[in-house]
């Protein structure tokens, strides 16, 4: 959260990578990913999705965009791509919902090269 605020204060656009959590890293046998709960099945995310009659993925994407964070979700399904493009028009989360999702923060960083290259290539941002 501190990095996001710093970037906003300094006119730097933050781009979310792996908006849905560890899914992409599980197949790579990343130990942190294996032990990280799937956000699609988290009770808080499911409840908010049910309240708005949307998919859990849409809740996660909107949480980012509503906070001014750019997203780059991928999908092989045309319908999902269309849903992702329309998320800002389709869903607005309440302040309480934004806070509830933000409280799920575990300060994980799955895409840190430091973890993959035995400390030879640190990333500082």
Language model features: what each stretch is:
Residues 1-125:
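Beta/alpha (TIM)-barrel catalytic core signal, keyed to glycine-rich beta->alpha loops juxtaposed to Asp/Glu
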């Amino acid at each position: 959260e501190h990095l996001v605020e710093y970037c906003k204060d300094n006119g730097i656009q933050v781009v979310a990578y792996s908006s849905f959590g560890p899914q992409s890293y599980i197949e790579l046998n990343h130990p942190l990913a294996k032990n990280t709960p799937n956000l699609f099945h988290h009770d808080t995310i499911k409840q908010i999705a049910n309240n708005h009659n949307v998919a859990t993925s849409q809740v996660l994407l909107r949480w980012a965009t509503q906070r001014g964070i750019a997203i780059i979700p991928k999908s092989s399904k045309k319908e999902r791509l269309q849903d992702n493009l329309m998320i800002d028009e389709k869903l607005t989360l309440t302040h309480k919902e934004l806070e509830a999702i933000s409280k799920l923060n575990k300060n994980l960083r799955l895409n840190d090269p430091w973890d993959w290259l035995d400390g030879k290539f640190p990333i500082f941002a």
